[in-house]
Amino acid sequence: MAKYIKRKSSTSRQGFEEFGTEILLLCQLRHPNLVNLIGYCIDEQEMILIFELIANGSLMEHFLYRDQDDPLKWKRRLQICIGVARGLHYLHTGVKHTIIHRDVKLENILLGESWKAKLANFVLCKKGPPSLSKALIRIDSVVKGTVGYLDPAYLRTSQLTDKTDVYCFGVVLFEVLCARRSVDMESEREQSMAVWAPACVEDGTINQIIDPYLIGKIAPECFKIYVDIATSCLREDNLERPAIGEVEVGLEHALELQEYADAAMRKDDVGSGSDQ
């Protein structure tokens, strides 16, 4: 059976330390929406992590190199996003100490069998206070992450919080809806999805930038909730962003509304067919 393998040079001290940190963390985590470590190997030249079978690649591959004849259906995209939210919810509240991923992006969302979302790449993770503590999660940290996903509050203060992951996930939600990268390098102004999409929501032009394949395929009630959630994740003030648990519940509700609308449409189709 094929496995997902991650390789890294062992000649760098920083790389070796990051590798060790990732192994220790992965050995403590068990959740269906986190990639499962099977084993690892270290020699003089290379460090290797061996993960479970990843049957359908990364989410990025399905947008950057997607098959134009078979793009991801809307419900599947929504289910993938719910899976990522569940994985993040577990990291933030389901382990002894809150864990902040810090690098939630399309490349780090892998798709296993049955298209189950698997959050991967824990190199940049930071451990916070006990997850059951009522203390506000704030960790002083050297700013790290990926351009296009970086939380402006984190950039400004160097204080890492669970809402940093929420911000990254908000970018992912709009990427999934629009089938566009977080930063459009082909644009003259190198537009950032985190700025551009909420601006389009505000001025009522969001329908003009969503994936053309999805036009007419998303139930209006589902669309509104999804867009509202994505926009709220990208609020400038991190205290105004929802917790990831709220995001998870909202996305699950959006899926329910989509399934209800799809069922109603099938019922109408059957009814109209029987009338002929």
Regions flagged by a language model, labelled:
Residues 1-276:
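Conserved eukaryotic protein kinase-like
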